Amino acid sequence: MVYIQNTHLNDKKQIYQACAQIYGLGHHHCLQICDVLGVSPETRLGMLSTGQHTLLAQIITQNYDTGSDVRRFTRQNIQRLVNIHSYRGYRHIQGLPVRGQRSHGNARTVRKLKNVIKI
């Protein structure tokens, strides 16, 4: 197991799949990271040397927002919508679909399960 950005990554997975488990990194960013490392994306994470592991961690921390930074940024954006009393902020408060989806059908289960934002 490799520990990068507060996430345990499985050694047996390919590099681009393992990196995608870090919150804030998708497959596209993981492929870019593999290009910078000079390693094939299909290479298993366990096959990398310790130097490459440290370089991987360094590339991710310096060039990408991950983990709690992304969560905080998203939370601040939602809170901004709530503070300016926009329609989208109101929908977030109510726990309803924000982007114009129907609320008669599928949103019923979401309304039951979703935690409502408190002001």
UniProtKB/Swiss-Prot annotation:
Q: Give a yes or no for keyword Nucleus in this entry.
A: no
Q: Which GO terms describe its cellular component?
A: mitochondrion; small ribosomal subunit
Question: Could you state a single Gene Ontology molecular function term?
Answer: rRNA binding
Please tell me whether the keyword Repeat is annotated for this protein.
no
Q: Give the GO biological process terms.
A: translation
Q: Which InterPro entries match?
A: Rbsml_uS13_C, Ribosomal_uS13, Ribosomal_uS13-like_H2TH, Ribosomal_uS13_CS
Query: Where does it reside?
Result: Mitochondrion
Report the Pfam families cross-referenced here.
Ribosomal_S13
Disulfide connectivity for this sequence is none
What is the top-level taxon of the source organism? Answer: Eukaryota
Q: Which UniProt keywords apply?
A: Mitochondrion, Ribonucleoprotein, Ribosomal protein, RNA-binding, rRNA-binding
Write out the similarity annotation.
Belongs to the universal ribosomal protein uS13 family.
Q: How does it assemble?
A: Part of the small ribosomal subunit.
Q: What does this protein do?
A: Located at the top of the head of the small subunit, it contacts several helices of the small subunit rRNA.
- Output this protein's name: Small ribosomal subunit protein uS13m
Q: What is the lineage of its organism?
A: Eukaryota, Viridiplantae, Chlorophyta, core chlorophytes, Trebouxiophyceae
